[in-house]
Amino acid sequence: MANAGLQLLGFILASLGWIGSIVSTALPQWKIYSYAGDNIVTAQAIYEGLWMSCVSQSTGQIQCKVFDSLLNLNSTLQATRALMVIGILLGLIAIFVSTIGMKCMRCLEDDEVQKMWMAVIGGIIFVISGLATLVATAWYGNRIVQEFYDPMTPVNARYEFGQALFTGWAAASLCLLGGALLSCSCPRKTTSYPTPRPYPKPTPSSGKDYV
C-alpha cells in the first residue's frame, strides 16, 4: 500500500505546479528589455509575454498592446502558447483523476487496486503536463538567447529572461516532482502460491489384517 502522506504531498506539489503554469501563461513578463549598450533608457521598462507587449513608465503608468493577429506571430510564440495551454488542460484532467485515487477520498473504496491505479494515472498525466510546460519555457528561453547573441539583432532590440519564464520553470519542476510521487502509488504484484491439498492420514494397521 502506498503511503498516504507521500501521496498527498505529491498531489499538493503537482497542484501548485499547475497553478504556477496558469500564472506563468498569464503574466506578460516572459522577456524583458535588456539594458545593454549605449542606448540605455531607464525611464521605461519594456517587456513581452505570450499574449501582449507592455511598456511601464517610471511614473507608474503601464501601456499594453494585445497581439491581435495570430498569423503575424512567429512560430516559437505560437508553439509556446499551444504547449502551455495543453499543459494546463492536462493538469486539470490530472487533478480530477488523481483526486479519485487519493486515499483520503471515499471514491472507489470497494476496489483499492483500481483506486491506486487512478492515482498512478493522475501522476502520469501530471508528469506529461510538466513536460509540456518545460518544453515550452525551454524553447522560448532558447529563442531569447539566440536573438540576444545574434550579431544581426540591434542592441536596442535585445531581451533577457523575464519573471514569467522562471515561474514556468518552477511550475514544471513541481508538476514533474508531484507527478512522480503520485506514480509511486503503483500497486505491487503479489506472488500467489497454490493452496496445499490436504492428504488423508494413514490409518494405523491392526492385527486383524493378519491371519
Swiss-Prot record:
GO CC field: apical plasma membrane; basolateral plasma membrane; bicellular tight junction; cell junction; cell-cell junction; lateral plasma membrane; plasma membrane; protein-containing complex
Positions on the Cytoplasmic side per record topology: 1-7, 103-115, 185-211
Region feature Disordered, mapped onto this chain: 190-211
Superkingdom to which the source organism belongs: Eukaryota
Residues in coiled coil: none
TM helices/strands, residue ranges: 8-28, 82-102, 116-136, 164-184
Interactions with TJP1, TJP2, TJP3 and PATJ: annotated segments: 210-211
Keyword Transmembrane: yes
InterPro entries, sorted: Claudin (IPR006187), Claudin1 (IPR003548), Claudin_CS (IPR017974), PMP22/EMP/MP20/Claudin (IPR004031)
Disulfide pattern: 54-64
Broad class of the protein's primary localization: other
PROSITE patterns (UniProt xref): CLAUDIN
Example GO molecular function: virus receptor activity
Acetylation listed as a keyword: no
Tissue: Detected in epididymis (at protein level). Detected in testis and epididymis.
Recorded topology in the membrane: Multi-pass membrane protein
Family assignment from sequence similarity: Belongs to the claudin family.
Subunit annotation: Can form homo- and heteropolymers with other CLDN. Homopolymers interact with CLDN3, but not CLDN2, homopolymers. Directly interacts with TJP1/ZO-1, TJP2/ZO-2 and TJP3/ZO-3. Interacts with MPDZ and PATJ. Interacts with OCLN, CD81, CLDN4, CLDN6 and CLDN9.
Protein name: Claudin-1
